[in-house]
């Protein structure tokens, strides 16, 4: 039994954050009904696509859900979605700002409704991961030190964080409702997620209390010693020493003990202190780099594996997909996804009692419409035929 078995959630969404929230809840055992307009929302054909034209992206974020397609512009379509929410478990997650889907209207129909509204910005204005990220400061400290302009990271970090915060909010609201009977109106802004993260990590506190701001470091790690190195056969490694022992092992394995000691004496610093290791990271990296360029990747891996040094080689996505960390990992299982094919798909990263909840295939768009309307609203075959002929639903 999974934690959310027996819970039904209606999701009216698109793109990353809200679908990720719904998929996370599904992996925890909830029955998640994704409602889309007829023909699909604006993310239904988002790249990458499989050879069949099916969106790998869309199926990846909607695994394990059920799909209903309804005319979201018609009053009858509005009524169907409202009923699915209020006559079901009274839980909806959406990133769509639709008047007919707002909390006040739904709570008038069901007082304990749990309504989670994802926003771009807290004032209701539009914001997406890429624009929110630009306003947070992160692109100006990302990338090579010599680079003058901003560098966007590829990971839609704020969408991912927002989706997981939203899933947490749903679980917390269910817990509260179970104890008090109260519903919840939850708003979660993408920009607030990014700002809170920057604040919690000290990036906004630093200029307020110290009058300083973070600078671009390339692949170095702020406040610690960490750097990337290249092997003789052109394989790049990320090497991190968080503790004194890590650093001592790196010095020993690279045979730089005498040089590091002489450097410490010349600079009158103590490399057992992480602050000094960080301040003089460039000259230390110069000492260590020779050892890396004198050895092949396999030699480096073998040598560092016998130490406490934290390291990993950089890999492409294609290399990762073939690595035992994927192919021999219980997190992944073979998924037969219609339109895409068989592939190793991740389940829920959290293992419950040693087992990762597995993913089920994403639905075809609208494949469950008739079954959902019959199961939750009691609509008959003739009702569904009438709604289909009126283009209120698509099955």
Model regions and ranges:
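Short, well-structured beta-strand/strand-turn elements
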Residues: 32, 305-319, 379-385
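N-terminal helix-loop segment corresponding to the beta1-alpha1 unit
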Residues: 1-179, 298, 364, 370-395
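Conserved Rossmann-fold dehydrogenase catalytic segment
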Residues: 147-155, 178-194, 216-219, 269-270
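Oxidoreductase and adenylate-handling cofactor-binding alpha/beta cores
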Residues: 163-183, 200-207, 251-263
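Aromatic-enriched alpha-helical interface/lid elements that frame and gate functional surfaces
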Residues: 225-307, 311
